[in-house]
Amino acid sequence: MGPDTAWLSRKWRDELGYGSALVPRRAAMVLPALEPPRDIVVTSEKALKIDAARQLALDLFGAEVPVEGVKTVSGVPEQPVDDEALRGAHHRTEGVDAECVVSFENGLFFETVDAPEAWTAVEDYVGPRGVAVDRAAVVVVVRGTRYEGVGAGVLVPRRFAEASEASEWALTAGKAMAAAWGVPHDDWHAALVGVDRAALIRSVWWPREST
């Protein structure tokens, strides 16, 4: 049985006064029934991503699988934008030799959303390009076959997306937010909407889609 995923349909939440919102996933990753791999290599040494890969093994393969993290290069700006997130996740898998490779890359996706009349923070979030949604792009390579998806996201306050753009994407929106608000630069999502980054990553493949 999977986790409680009711939050996936709860778009608008403002309990802490930031005005941010959770936006449902963009493209689910659909994998067929597969035998568990002998090992999983994650294209990052960050503990959060290694833990996410362990959870992926349980969710998709139904088994615990040895997981190792390695340092890789994304080939995209520090703050990926739109298609750069998936491109960066794919780039990170190049040259990594394992039966299963898992790659994560967060990025800003500029999108349009249906804003409810009760949303009082419209001007703080909606700019000329729409709203900036921070989402995780995930690529999984299993025995040479590639799968990809883009998970649920969190609206990024306009000022921080614009600060990142002004730096020519060298400064991430998360680091700009951390400097202003004191939230963790790599997991500010929990502070704004009560859903942490690990859950947002997991939303790419869970609940599992039927094939």
Where are these regions (language model features)?
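Anionic-ligand binding patches
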Residues: Q79-T211
